[in-house]
C-alpha cells in the first residue's frame, strides 16, 4: 500500500465527510417523507371518521377562506364543525354575535334557548335582531337571521327558561355550551349540569364597556365555575345592562371571541396536554386592551367537580339545590321603607299641579343618566358614586344650604330601587319628611307623561 502524504490524507478525510453529509441528507429526507405519508394517512382516517359525507361545491366555496388558514385544520376541521352540535344559552348582547359567527362558520347544529322577546332597547347591541322583529321571541328572531345567513346550519329553538327541570334534557343533546347569560343563578345551574354531563362551557360576560371570557370544565380536566367562585356574589353587587349600561361593540367583541374559542375547541386546537385555564379580559376605555390571565386549575375541594363531589344529578333535578337562594335576591315585594315614607307618581303629580306645598325633588341617578333627561327643578345627588358612600352626619353637606331637616324632600330614581335606599338614608340622618316616589321615572313616563323619555 502506497503511503499517503499529509495533504492527501486531509483531502481524503474531507471527501469522506462530504459523502457522510450527503448520506445524512438522503436519510433525513426519507424520514420526512415517511412521516408525511403517515400523517396524511392518519388525517385521512380521521377525516373519514369525522364525517364520511363530502362537502358540496357550495360549501367548499363558502368555507374556503377559513379552511386555507394553516392553524384552522383544513378540510378535516371543517368537517368537525359540520358534525358538531352546540347550545347557546341567551340570544342577547353576547349570544347575538356568537350565533352569527358560529352559524357563518358552518356549525352543523345550533340550539338557542331564550324566553325573552326582542325590545327596541336591545337593538344597539343585540345585532342579530331587526327592528321589524321587535316583540317576537329572541330565539325565533335569531333563527330567522341565521337561516338567511347560512341554510346549511340546523337551528333548534327553545323558547323557555333553563331550569332544573329541563336543563339535563336540553344540554345532553349538545357537544358544547356557550353561557351567554347575565344571571348568577343560571350560570351556576349551567355549570353544574355541564360538569355532571361532561360538557365543556365557553362562558362570557360584559357590562358597560368591559367584558371577559373563559373556558370551563374543559374535557373534564379544566376548572369549573365553582372552582373560581365557590361562593355566589352579593346580590347588591350585581349590575344589569339596564342599570349599568352597555356599549354594543364592547360586549360584541366578547361574543365574537367566544365564537373563536368555540371553533378552536371543536376543531381540536386545545388538548389535555396544552390547555391552560385562562381568563381573557377586555376594556374599551381609555385605550382598548385585551389581557389574558392564567387561572388556577381544577380544585380538589370543588363541590361539583372535585375529588369528593357533593352535588349530584338527582339533587339538581329534584330541586334540592335552590340556585336563586344560593345566589341571593333582592326582595322587591318587601321594600325597606314603611308605607308612610312612599308616594305614587300620581300623588306626586297632583302635588306639582296643586303647587300647595314647597318641596325639593332629589334625583339620585348617576350624573350621566341625569343629563339624559330629568324632571324640571330636580337636583342631582349621585347615589351609587356619592350619596351611598356619605356618612349620615355629613349628608347636609351634599344638600343645598337652604334645606333643613324639617323641609319636605321627595326622592326619585330610574326604577324606584335606589330611591328607596336613599330615602332610608335621609330618614336615618334626621330628614323625617323625606319620601320615595314609587316606580321612579320609568313609572312617571308610563302613567303621567308619555313624552318623558324612557331609555
Curated annotation (Swiss-Prot):
Binding site for ATP: 93, 114, 121-125, 138, 182-183
Chief localization: cytoplasm
GO cellular component: cytosol
Cofactor(s) needed by this chain: Zn(2+)
Active site (UniProt): 241 (glycyl thioester intermediate), 413 (cysteine persulfide intermediate)
InterPro entries: MOCS3/Uba4 (IPR028885), Rhodanese-like_dom (IPR001763), Rhodanese-like_dom_sf (IPR036873), ThiF/MoeB/HesA (IPR045886), ThiF_NAD_FAD-bd (IPR000594), Ubiquitin-activating_enz (IPR035985)
Gene3D superfamilies named among the record's database cross-references: NAD(P)-binding Rossmann-like Domain (3.40.50.720), Rhodanese-like domain (3.40.250.10)
Pathway noted in the entry: tRNA modification; 5-methoxycarbonylmethyl-2-thiouridine-tRNA biosynthesis
Subcellular location: Cytoplasm, Cytosol
Family: In the N-terminal section; belongs to the HesA/MoeB/ThiF family. UBA4 subfamily.
Protein name, UniProt field: Adenylyltransferase and sulfurtransferase UBA4
Amino acid at each position: 500500500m502506497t503511503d499517503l502524504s499529509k495533504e492527501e490524507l486531509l483531502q481524503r478525510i474531507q471527501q469522506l465527510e462530504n459523502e457522510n453529509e450527503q448520506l445524512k441528507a438522503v436519510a433525513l429526507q426519507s424520514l420526512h417523507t415517511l412521516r408525511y405519508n403517515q400523517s396524511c394517512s392518519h388525517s385521512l382516517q380521521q377525516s373519514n371518521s369525522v364525517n364520511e359525507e363530502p362537502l358540496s361545491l357550495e360549501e367548499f366555496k363558502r368555507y374556503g377562506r377559513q379552511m386555507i388558514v394553516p392553524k384552522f385544520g383544513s378540510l378535516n376541521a371543517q368537517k368537525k364543525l359540520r358534525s358538531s352540535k352546540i347550545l347557546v344559552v341567551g340570544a342577547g348582547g353576547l349570544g347575538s354575535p356568537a350565533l352569527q359567527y358560529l352559524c357563518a362558520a358552518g356549525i352543523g347544529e345550533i340550539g338557542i334557548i331564550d324566553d325573552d322577546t326582542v325590545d327596541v332597547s336591545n337593538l344597539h347591541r343585540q345585532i342579530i335582531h331587526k327592528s321589524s322583529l321587535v316583540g317576537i321571541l329572541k330565539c325565533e328572531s335569531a333563527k330567522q337571521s341565521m337561516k338567511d345567513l347560512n341554510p346549511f346550519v340546523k337551528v333548534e329553538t327553545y323558547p323557555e327558561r333553563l331550569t332544573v327541570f329541563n336543563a339535563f334534557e336540553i344540554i345532553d343533546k349538545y357537544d358544547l355550551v356557550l353561557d351567554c347569560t347575565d344571571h348568577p343563578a343560571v350560570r351556576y345551574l349551567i355549570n353544574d349540569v355541564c360538569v355532571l354531563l361532561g360538557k365543556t362551557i365557553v362562558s362570557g360576560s360584559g357590562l358597560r364597556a368591559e367584558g371577559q371570557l373563559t373556558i370551563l370544565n374543559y374535557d373534564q380536566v379544566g376548572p369549573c365555575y365553582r372552582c373560581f367562585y365557590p361562593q355566589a356574589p352579593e346580590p347588591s353587587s350585581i349590575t344589569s345592562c339596564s342599570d349599568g349600561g352597555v356599549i354594543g361593540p364592547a360586549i360584541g367583541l366578547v361574543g365574537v371571541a367566544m365564537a373563536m374559542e368555540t371553533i378552536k375547541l371543536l376543531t381540536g386546537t386545545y388538548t389535555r396536554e396544552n390547555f391552560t385555564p385562562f381568563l381573557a379580559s377586555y376594556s374599551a376605555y381609555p385605550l382598548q386592551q385585551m389581557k389574558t390571565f392564567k387561572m388556577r386549575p381544577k380544585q380538589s375541594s370543588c363541590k361539583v367537580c372535585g375529588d369528593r363531589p357533593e352535588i349530584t344529578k338527582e339533587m339538581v333535578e329534584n330541586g334540592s339545590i335552590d340556585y336563586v337562594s344560593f345566589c341571593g335576591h333582592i326582595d322587591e315585594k318587601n321594600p325597606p321603607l314603611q308605607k308612610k315614607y312612599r308616594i305614587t307618581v300620581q300623588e306626586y303629580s297632583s302635588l306639582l299641579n296643586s303647587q300647595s306645598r314647597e318641596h325639593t325633588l332629589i334625583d339620585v341617578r348617576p350624573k350621566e343618566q341625569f343629563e339624559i333627561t330629568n324632571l324640571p327643578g330636580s337636583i342631582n345627588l349621585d347615589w351609587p358614586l356619592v350619596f351611598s358612600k356619605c356618612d349620615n352626619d355629613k349628608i347636609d353637606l351634599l344638600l343645598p344650604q337652604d334645606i333643613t331637616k324639617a323641609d319636605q324632600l321627595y326622592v326619585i330614581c330610574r326604577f324606584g330601587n335606589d330611591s328607596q335606599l336613599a330615602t332610608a338614608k335621609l330618614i336615618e340622618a334626621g330628614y323625617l319628611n323625606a319620601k320615595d316616589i314609587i316606580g321612579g321615572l320609568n313609572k312617571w313616563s308610563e302613567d303621567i307623561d308619555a313624552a318623558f323619555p324612557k331609555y
